[in-house]
């Protein structure tokens, strides 16, 4: 009699497409796990009818509005298509504000299908959401002011190095944008644990970009960054403690959200992915 054979082990990258704990190893394993999370989120949304229904409403409503704007013009077919795409691109940030509560409810509903304990939705008001969007836009802009000043100094005192510095500036800009894509995605994935103490304090450690400018001449600038970034202390703490994970997660989310209409379709997947990341990081954290 031959001994029964066991099923071959599932390769790690394929296992990352199913809900499960963080990899035991850091480095490339954690980066790959983070990179796979948006695809995991998409897979869970498609497989769960309730999540798919909740995710479809923002897409249909927003796309329908853009279609109505295009049909309201007197242009031909090509002109209407151009207006549809222009409206889509111009209003691309709007779904985050208009459908914020839908995405928050989606985040809470996704926890059980992801193998996590049930929680309730975190529901900030519209005024808070608008204020946070303005804060983030300001942070994205003024966070690059030192790069612009450095470029001006290079042009003034070392013109020959200016072309090379342009590439450095673009790389820094891309990194800064990716950083805030991750922060926004993680923010959308937050839920409320009913058993947690009310008003739990956010981490008080300054984020890296605040500490970077804590030099005598730039302390006021550093303080401004600290005040503007206060709503995202939880997310920034996770970025600092799991850099490989958030780099992979950010690259995966950025690839999904790079094209406006694709971003609208895949944003629910990014929200579900963020829920899974936050849940598994919480599970892996040592008890307080």
Where in the sequence are the language-model features?
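Selective recognition of hydrophobic, aromatic-rich stretches within alpha-helical transmembrane segments
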Residues: 77-114, 154-223, 261-285
């Amino acid at each position: 009699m031959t001994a029964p054979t066991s099923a071959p082990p599932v390769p790690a990258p394929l296992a990352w497409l199913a809900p499960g704990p963080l990899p035991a190893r850091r480095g490339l394993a954690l980066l790959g796990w983070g990179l796979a999370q948006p695809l995991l989120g998409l897979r869970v949304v498609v497989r769960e009818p309730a999540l798919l229904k909740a995710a479809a409403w923002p897409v249909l409503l927003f796309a329908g509005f853009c279609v109505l704007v295009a049909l309201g013009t007197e242009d031909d077919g090509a002109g209407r298509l151009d207006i549809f795409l222009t409206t889509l691109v111009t209003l691309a940030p709007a779904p985050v504000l208009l459908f914020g509560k839908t995405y928050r409810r989606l985040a809470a509903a996704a926890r059980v299908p992801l193998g996590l304990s049930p929680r309730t939705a975190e529901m900030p008001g519209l005024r808070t959401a608008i204020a946070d969007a303005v804060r983030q836009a300001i942070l994205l802009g003024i966070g690059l002011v030192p790069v612009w000043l450095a470029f001006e100094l290079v042009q003034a005192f070392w013109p020959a190095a200016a072309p090379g510095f342009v590439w450095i500036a673009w790389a820094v800009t891309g990194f800064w944008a990716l950083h805030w894509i991750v922060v926004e995605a993680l923010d959308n994935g937050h839920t409320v644990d009913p058993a947690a103490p009310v008003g739990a304090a956010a981490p008080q450690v300054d984020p890296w970009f605040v500490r970077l400018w804590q030099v005598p001449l730039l302390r006021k600038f550093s303080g401004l960054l600290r005040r503007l970034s206060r709503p995202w202390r939880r997310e920034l703490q996770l970025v600092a403690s799991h850099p490989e994970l958030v780099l992979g997660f950010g690259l995966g989310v950025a690839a999904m959200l790079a094209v406006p209409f694709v971003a609208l379709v895949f944003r629910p997947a990014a929200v579900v992915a963020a829920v899974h990341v936050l849940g598994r990081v919480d599970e892996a954290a040592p008890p307080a």
